């Protein structure tokens, strides 16, 4: 039987990993072994980061809503409870956008939540 060599295949595979390591510092961009290890680690960090981004944005929206509601004499939790009682179904992202861009409309929503709390 003829001897089988995988030169082209191996080179292509290694080249693929080196290409993914573009922009890394030192041997992590040129050495196959180091590049492969770093790309695997980077992919793991990216996966975790995609999950954390959702948490970070939710907490940012909550901070913004809380900051906008405090001058009206409510805390974030009582405001959200008031919204629930008033049957207002607006997500936190939209509430935070309203608080920043349309403060008058946001104040109307706060007043409705206050009314629902007083009943």
Curated annotation (Swiss-Prot):
SUPFAM superfamilies, sorted: Ribosomal protein L20
Pfam (any one): Ribosomal_L20
Key word Protease present: no
InterPro entries: Ribosomal_bL20 (IPR005813), RIBOSOMAL_L20_CS (IPR049946), Ribosomal_protein_bL20_C (IPR035566)
A single GO BP: ribosomal large subunit assembly
Top-level division of the source organism's lineage: Bacteria
Keywords from the UniProt entry: Ribonucleoprotein, Ribosomal protein, RNA-binding, rRNA-binding
Keyword Ribonucleoprotein part of the UniProt annotation: yes
One Gene Ontology cellular component: ribosome
Function: Binds directly to 23S ribosomal RNA and is necessary for the in vitro assembly process of the 50S ribosomal subunit. It is not involved in the protein synthesizing functions of that subunit.
Family the UniProt entry places it in: Belongs to the bacterial ribosomal protein bL20 family.
Protein's name according to its UniProt entry: Large ribosomal subunit protein bL20
Organism for this UniProt entry: Mycoplasma capricolum subsp. capricolum (strain California kid / ATCC 27343 / NCTC 10154)
């Amino acid at each position: 039987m003829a001897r089988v060599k995988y030169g082209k295949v191996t080179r292509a595979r290694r080249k693929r990993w080196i290409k993914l390591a573009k922009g890394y510092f030192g041997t992590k961009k040129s050495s196959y072994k180091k590049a492969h290890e770093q790309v695997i680690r980077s992919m793991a960090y990216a996966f975790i980061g995609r999950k954390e981004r959702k948490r970070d944005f939710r907490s940012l929206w909550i901070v913004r809503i809380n900051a906008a509601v405090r001058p009206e004499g409510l805390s974030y939790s009582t405001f959200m409870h008031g919204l629930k009682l008033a049957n207002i179904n607006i997500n936190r992202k939209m509430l935070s956008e309203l608080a920043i861009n349309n403060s008058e409309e946001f104040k109307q929503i706060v007043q409705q939540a206050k009314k629902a709390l007083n009943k």
